[in-house]
Amino acid sequence: CQLLLALRPENCGTFFFENGLLPDTTTLDPKGVNYRNSVPRDAAFYRSYRAPDGAAEARSQLIPRQPRNKDLEPVSLPERYVFIPFQDDRDTQVRLFSPWVGDMRQLFALGKRLAVESGLTVVFKEHPSSRESYPDLHAEAHDKLLFANGNPTQELIQNCEFVVTINSTVGLESLLLGKPVMTLGQAFFNIPGLVVHADSANELLESARGFPNWPLEDEVRHGFLRYLAAEYCIQGAWRDADRAQLQRVARRMLALTGSA
């Protein structure tokens, strides 16, 4: 994207298309995607946000991602645990927007330290489309540090105490399901009252020790999700686009260029 932006003619507008931030939606943003998108970052905006009459609402049913390995068996989950989803090391979310966690082995090391120093059980799940394999990390797993690659992500979110993520879509899905989230990287949803954020291992451990007394606000979370569903996301997934969805995209493009 940055190369294309550098090569574009002067005064040439841009639109960025991406998978939708909510289930069964599409992203169309004139500024960028992920951390570079145009979603407001001000908690006060969401505290006072009111969706237009008849606007779409966020769905709380996630759409499962198909794993590369379809022979994975679910594991029995402990009664209390922290969920840490892996991301794809090659993705820009990690390469560009993760200042202090360079890859999933570093993320695993943080989870391991969290389990040792806090006594919490930590459950990991590898990214379903990642080409990386981690036999060395699986060899370190035990009853307080385990992988649940065969379990549905929604189950792992709903049954955990809280979610720790760099900046994954799983963090956004966790907000959708009403779970507390701690981010470690640059995420567009790093908004006070919406998530807690850690810029170091020490901050991660300190926040974990402070759970559940985190400064989170339901009002901010509800306003954030209402805004995404009502105004930011375009209803319908681009992979299954029909005429109506293409018309919604066209209307959004016209509105953003002032041509509507």
Where are these regions (language model features)?
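A donor-sugar binding/catalytic signature common to diverse glycosyltransferases
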Residues: 1, 150-197
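Active-site and donor-binding regions of nucleotide-sugar-utilizing enzymes
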Residues: 1-39
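A short helix->loop->beta-strand "cap" motif at the edges of active sites that frequently abuts
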Residues: 10-14, 120, 179
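Generic beta-sheet signal
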Residues: 15-18, 125, 166, 184
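Short loop/turn segments at strand-loop or loop-helix junctions that form parts
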Residues: 19, 79-93, 126-127, 186
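Leloir-type glycosyltransferase catalytic cores
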Residues: 32-79, 194-260
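Mid-to-C-terminal functional-domain signal that highlights helix-capping/loop sites
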Residues: 92-107
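Catalytic donor nucleotide-activated moiety binding site of glycosyltransferases and closely related
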Residues: 108-147
